[in-house]
């Protein structure tokens, strides 16, 4: 079983959602989006070992090799890694394809996933906190509308990028009141960030573009 690759079915499900149960079934037209999703799955299947890629989820947050906190405002995207005392900030990208804040919340989680492996020698278990419940749900269920599917596919690409070290990801909801540093970071309230996390290193980044 390859549960992480279920994202290849997102556009197929979206097409099937319009089918009428009281009508005879029709052939499914394979458009460019469906074709791209299926090729994405085939590419991973050609490289992955012949065992399931979903490892044990029976682990605690204290077992994580690295932890990130993410947040978004209309001013920017921000995430930070407390144990590494490193923060990342970016301006809001232009022309989001879907609901602005939700899309950028998901994009910030993907960005944290991508940067996590550059800060830790070996990442086997990664925890990411977000105060956006919808974002938490799509990453943990690997189920979203097609507009967000490229973000989820990007996360799976990174989790499976090293077949000898597949990464377990756990995205967890946190209340906004407890996500102070990431919130301040996204709003460019850097003085507040320093008050709560002295000595933290500031980096800018460019979010993935789809």
Language model feature labels by segment:
Residues 1, 167-210:
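C-terminal functional segments of enzyme domains
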Residues 113-180, 187:
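RNase H catalytic domain
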Residues 2-4, 25-38, 57-60, 95-101, ...:
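Conserved, non-catalytic sequence blocks in retroelement Pol enzymes and Pol-derived host proteins
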Residues 12, 69-71, 79, 108, ...:
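Mobile genetic element proteins and their domesticated derivatives, centered on retroelements
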Residues 82-107, 111, 115, 133-151:
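A short, polar/acidic, helix/strand-boundary loop motif
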Residues 61-74:
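Two-metal-ion RNase H-like nuclease active-site motif
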Residues 1-57:
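C-terminal reverse transcriptase regions that engage the nucleic-acid substrate
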Residues 12-15, 75-77, 87-88, 134-138, ...:
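Flexible loop/turn segments at secondary-structure boundaries
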């Amino acid at each position: 079983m390859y549960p992480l690759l279920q994202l290849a079915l997102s556009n197929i499900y979206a097409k099937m959602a319009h089918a009428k149960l009281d009508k005879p079934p029709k052939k499914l037209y394979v458009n460019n989006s469906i074709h791209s999703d299926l090729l994405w799955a085939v590419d991973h299947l050609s490289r992955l070992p012949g065992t399931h890629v979903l490892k044990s989820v029976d682990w605690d947050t204290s077992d994580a090799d690295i932890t990130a906190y993410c947040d978004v405002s209309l001013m920017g995207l921000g995430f930070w890694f407390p144990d590494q005392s490193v923060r990342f900030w970016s301006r809001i990208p232009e022309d989001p394809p879907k609901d602005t804040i939700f899309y950028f919340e998901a994009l910030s989680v993907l960005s944290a996933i991508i940067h996590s492996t550059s800060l830790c020698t070996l990442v086997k278990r990664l925890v990411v906190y977000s105060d956006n419940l919808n974002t938490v749900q799509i990453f943990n269920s690997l189920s979203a509308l097609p507009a967000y599917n490229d973000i989820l596919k990007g996360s799976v690409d990174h989790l499976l990028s090293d077949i000898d070290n597949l990464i377990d990801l756990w995205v967890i909801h946190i209340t906004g009141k407890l996500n102070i540093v990431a919130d301040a970071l996204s709003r460019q309230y850097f003085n507040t960030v320093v008050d709560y996390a002295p000595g933290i290193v500031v980096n800018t980044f460019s979010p993935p573009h789809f």
